[in-house]
Amino acid sequence: MSGTFISFEGPDGAGKTSALQAITTQIKPVLGDQLVITREPGGNPISESIRAIILDRANTAMDYRTEALLYAAARRQHLAQTILPALAADKLVLCDRYVDSSVAYQGAGRQIGEDAVAQMNTFATDGLLPAVTVYFDVPAEIGLRRIQAHRDPQKVDRLDVEQAAFHDRVRAAYLRLQAAHPDRIKLIDATQKREAVVTTALTLIKQAAQNYFD
């Protein structure tokens, strides 16, 4: 495996997805087919089908452990079908969410246990972690205001509509993860202007994947 794997993480409303889109616009002309942009849950037809089940607002009866297991199943398929082949082909993979999301959202947000969810995902991924995780940090109240102000109501999912306490737990878990793994997880203050956030994220990507930009 010779490629480089970088994940993007953050609470809802942190702006990581729009930052990834802006970065893609800048580097795709340089990297061409060497660049793979993907997301979780999703990234291939099977995982996208699982995504639809997980995020469907009609699925209010979904058990929290079921939710965590579905995320892990989607992740395993995504890894096997999309990420590992891309890394084997020496590509730069930028992924919108990965294991840290499950630890934060299901482990802490759903309160089913951060360690338990981490172990579940270690099995699903065979322990594969990104070289770098770009973490977009924003207080929960700011993220939720952004969602309410800017997100298409038709695109609001089951997790977006959770109460503020849920999102506070998610952010706290992310900060614990960053403190525990500072060499991998790089924190960006996502309350800054979008241009500054994108510039910082792009700098981190270029540092982690320097050989693609030489």
UniProtKB/Swiss-Prot annotation:
This is Thymidylate kinase. InterPro entries: P-loop_NTPase, Thymidylate_kin-like_dom, Thymidylate_kin_CS, Thymidylate_kinase. Phosphorylation of dTMP to form dTDP in both de novo and salvage pathways of dTTP synthesis. One of its GO terms (molecular function) is dTMP kinase activity. The keyword ATP-binding applies. One of its GO terms (cellular component) is cytosol. The lineage of its organism: Bacteria, Bacillati, Bacillota, Bacilli, Lactobacillales. ATP binds at G10, P11, D12, G13, A14, G15, K16, T17. It is an enzyme of class 2 (transferase). It catalyses: dTMP + ATP = dTDP + ADP. CDD domains: TMPK. Keywords: ATP-binding, Kinase, Nucleotide biosynthesis, Nucleotide-binding, Transferase. GO terms for biological process: dTDP biosynthetic process; dTTP biosynthetic process; dUDP biosynthetic process. Belongs to the thymidylate kinase family. It comes from the Bacteria. NCBIfam families: DTMP_kinase (TIGR00041). It comes from Levilactobacillus brevis (strain ATCC 367 / BCRC 12310 / CIP 105137 / JCM 1170 / LMG 11437 / NCIMB 947 / NCTC 947) (Lactobacillus brevis). The keyword Acetylation does not apply. Gene3D superfamilies: P-loop containing nucleotide triphosphate hydrolases. Its EC number is 2.7.4.9.
